Regions:
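Short beta-strand segments enriched in small/hydrophobic residues
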Residues: 25-27, 64-86, 191, 199-203
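N-terminal helix-turn-helix DNA-binding module of bacterial transcription factors
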Residues: 1-66
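Short, flexible/disordered intra-domain loops and linkers
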Residues: 82-90, 118, 142-151
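Bacterial carbohydrate/catabolite-sensing allosteric modules
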Residues: 2-5, 17-18, 50-51, 58, ...
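N-terminal pre-catalytic "stem/leader" segment of glycosyltransferase-like enzymes
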Residues: 87-94, 108
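The feature primarily captures lumenal catalytic ectodomains
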Residues: 138-139
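A short, flexible beta-alpha/helix-coil linker loop
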Residues: 29-33, 79-84, 170-173
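Extracytoplasmic small-molecule ligand-binding "clamshell" domains
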Residues: 111, 116-118
Length: 351
């Protein structure tokens, strides 16, 4: 006898009983697999569904859809302060490349956030969850270690999401696409020394670039002079680099070259030197690190160490997608290749 569908919720068990099949067979018909069902049996199940008025469990379907969506969903978390980071052409280009590549690969960027937002428990529990994302990309993660209280947040994040890739540096032994800033700085400074410069100022950031600057001097038998180095304010890059360039050339008139921590600082330095009536590279040669798009179109064009941003993004997605299919317990980090791009600002012939 047909049950009263206005009184009771019809289940898959009811359909199976009416059709004279197992519940598994009903599931195969509803989901088109994974096992094949004969045409005769399929018709009996479909007839039972029609007679009983069966409707799939919407809640279960939503959970299934959510799980499927989460599998292809990625979160991006950036260290540092939001507005300051995205004002930097280097980082804004990386973020844009991440979104573009995700779209090409049919991956969904579920959220892009700054680490400071994770200190809000509501935000953390809503987003750092396997029902929301399967993978995480950590951009500029060294800035996430600025406060002791962040340690617990990071460890909870690692416990919840097991497919994580860091961009630039590794933290907590997580796999990373590592940018060797020390080697990049050594490359840029050595280029100036090989061109005959011995008095090289440094517009610095408080990171591994300082070690690379010092190592280049040591390798070429030159002393490190503290007075030749100014540490930039990373929250006001352009104005800080402009002002410190003027201070350096006024206080150290013997300088014949400058190494800037990044392209932004170098561009500000070129402007400052121009405003003081000095020519680049005739009076002061300049090198930097990043090779942003602006480096090639300013005049003089900037000699700078190329950071392979597009390759970094490509490697990141290759890693995350590979880990989903063939997870490796302790995946190795990858050192990103760097290359000096020689242009007019260093005064060297083009290569």
């Amino acid at each position: 006898m047909t049950r009263n569908i206005n009184r009771d919720i019809v289940t898959q068990e009811d359909v199976a009983k009416y059709a004279g099949v197992s519940r598994a067979i009903v599931s195969y018909v509803l989901n088109n697999g994974p096992r094949n069902v004969s045409e005769q049996t399929r018709n009996r199940v479909l007839n039972a569904i029609q007679v009983l008025g069966y409707r799939p469990n919407q809640h279960a379907q939503r959970l299934k859809l959510a799980a499927s969506a989460a599998e292809n969903s990625i979160g991006i978390i950036a260290g540092g302060k939001g507005s300051n980071l995205l004002e930097r052409p280097y980082y804004s280009a990386i973020v844009a490349n991440l979104f573009d590549r995700a779209h090409e690969l049919n991956q969904q960027i579920r959220f892009f956030s700054f680490f400071e937002n994770l200190t809000d428990p509501v935000f953390f529990n809503k987003n750092i969850h396997r029902e929301e994302i399967s993978s995480l990309i950590l951009l500029h993660p060294s800035m996430m270690l600025s406060e002791p209280a962040h340690d617990q947040i990071l460890r909870q994040m690692i416990e919840r999401i097991d497919n994580i890739i860091c961009l630039e540096q590794s933290i907590y032994n997580l796999p990373a696409l590592v940018l060797d800033l020390s080697a990049a700085a050594e490359m840029a400074v050595s280029h100036l020394i090989e061109l005959g410069h011995e008095h090289i100022g440094f517009l610095a950031l408080s990171d591994d670039r300082i070690a690379g600057y010092k190592r280049a001097l040591t390798l070429h038998g030159l002393p490190f002079r503290e007075e030749y180095m100014c540490v930039l304010d990373g929250t006001a890059m352009l104005s800080s680099a402009y002002e410190m360039t003027i201070a350096l050339i006024e206080q150290q008139p013997q300088l014949t070259a400058l190494f800037a921590a990044n392209d932004e600082a170098a561009i500000a330095a070129i402007a400052a030197l121009h405003d003081r009536g000095l020519s680049v590279p005739d009076d002061i040669a300049i090198t930097a690190i990043d090779n942003t798009e602006t480096a090639a179109i300013i005049r003089p064009a900037l000699t700078t160490v190329n950071v392979p941003r597009r390759e970094m993004v490509e490697y990141a997605f290759q890693f995350l997608l590979s880990q989903r299919v063939h997870p490796v317990a302790s995946p190795a980090s990858i050192m990103l290749p760097i290359e000096l791009i020689v242009r007019e600002s260093s005064g060297a012939p083009r290569r």
